[in-house]
Swiss-Prot record:
This is Imidazole glycerol phosphate synthase subunit HisF. The active site is at D11, D130. It is found in: Cytoplasm. Its EC number is 4.3.2.10.
Length: 258
C-alpha cells in the first residue's frame, strides 16, 4: 500500500503566499521560500503552489520563485498557474518543479492535458478541479478562473463528468478543490469525495475544509483519498505536520514518518 500524503498548499499572488475563504477575501500569509522550507522541515510529503491569478490575468506563473524553492527543499513540489503549452510546462519543470498542474487552461482546451501527458508522462500531469455544490440544483459544478472572484464563472461541466473526461485525456492525478469548504475548517466534503472516488482511477487529492487532525483521518479512511491538501491550518500553525502524521499513524493510516 502506498503511503498517504500530507500536502501543504501555498496560494501565490503578487509574489507572496495568500489565503482566502471560499476563494475570496485573501489575506497575506508571508514569503514563499521561507514557508516552503518550513513545511519541508516539518515533514510534508510534497508541496503545491498555485499562482491564483495567472490564468485570469492571461499570464504564466512567475518562474523565478520556482527556482528559489527548488534550491531550499528536498521534497517534490507541483506548480500551477496559467500553463497553456508544452513550452510553458517545460520551463517550469526545468526550474526544478516535479509536477505541473493545470486547471482553467484545461477547461479552455482539454487537448492540452493529452499533449502534456504525451510529452512529459502522466505521472507529471495534475489536473486541478474547482468544484462548487449548487444548493438549487443539488449538483456539483466545475468553476473556472477562481483566482479572481470578479472573473470566476461556472462552466458547463458537472464535476463527475469532468473527472472522467480529464482521466481519459491523460491526467495522472486529480486535486479536487471543494470551494464550499475552502478555508472554513469544518471538514472535507466526504460525500463529494466518495462520489469522485467511485469514478476516479488515478491518485485523488482532497482539498478544502481541513480544520482538525480528525478531518484528515476521515478523508483517508472514509473516502480513500491518496493525499490531503490543506493551507490555513498549516499557515496559522493550528496543526503541526509532524504531530499530524504521528496521529494518523496511530490510527492505522499508512503514512511516511520523518
Amino acid at each position: 500500500m502506498l503511503a498517504k500524503r500530507i500536502i501543504p498548499c501555498l496560494d501565490v499572488r503578487d509574489g507572496q503566499v495568500v489565503k482566502g475563504v471560499q476563494f475570496r477575501n485573501h489575506e497575506i500569509i508571508g514569503d514563499i521560500v521561507p514557508l516552503a522550507k518550513r513545511y519541508a522541515d516539518e515533514g510534508a510529503d510534497e508541496l503545491v503552489f498555485y499562482d491564483i491569478t495567472a490564468s485570469s490575468d492571461g499570464r504564466v506563473v512567475d518562474k523565478s520563485w520556482v527556482a528559489r524553492v527548488a534550491e531550499v527543499i528536498d521534497i517534490p513540489f507541483c506548480v500551477a498557474g496559467g500553463i497553456r503549452s508544452i513550452d510553458d510546462a517545460a520551463k517550469i519543470l526545468s526550474f526544478g518543479a516535479d509536477k505541473i498542474s493545470i486547471n482553467s487552461p484545461a477547461l479552455a482546451d482539454s487537448t492540452l492535458i493529452t499533449r502534456l501527458a504525451d510529452r512529459f508522462g502522466v505521472q507529471c500531469i495534475v489536473v486541478g478541479i474547482d468544484t462548487w455544490f449548487d444548493d438549487a440544483t443539488g449538483k456539483y459544478h466545475v468553476n473556472q478562473y477562481t483566482g479572481d472572484e470578479n472573473r470566476t464563472r461556472v462552466t458547463q461541466w458537472e464535476t463527475l463528468d469532468w473527472v472522467q473526461e480529464v482521466q481519459q485525456r491523460g491526467a495522472g492525478e486529480i486535486v479536487l478543490n471543494m470551494m464550499n469548504q475552502d478555508g472554513v475548517r469544518n471538514g472535507y466534503d466526504l460525500t463529494q469525495l466518495k462520489k469522485v472516488r467511485d469514478v476516479c482511477r488515478v491518485p485523488l487529492i482532497a482539498s478544502g475544509g481541513a480544520g482538525t487532525m480528525e478531518h484528515f483521518l476521515e478523508a483517508f479512511r472514509d473516502a480513500d483519498v491518496d493525499g490531503a491538501l490543506a493551507a490555513s491550518v498549516f499557515h496559522k500553525q493550528i496543526i503541526n505536520i509532524g504531530e499530524l502524521k504521528a496521529y494518523l499513524a496511530g490510527q492505522g493510516v499508512e503514512i511516511r514518518i520523518c
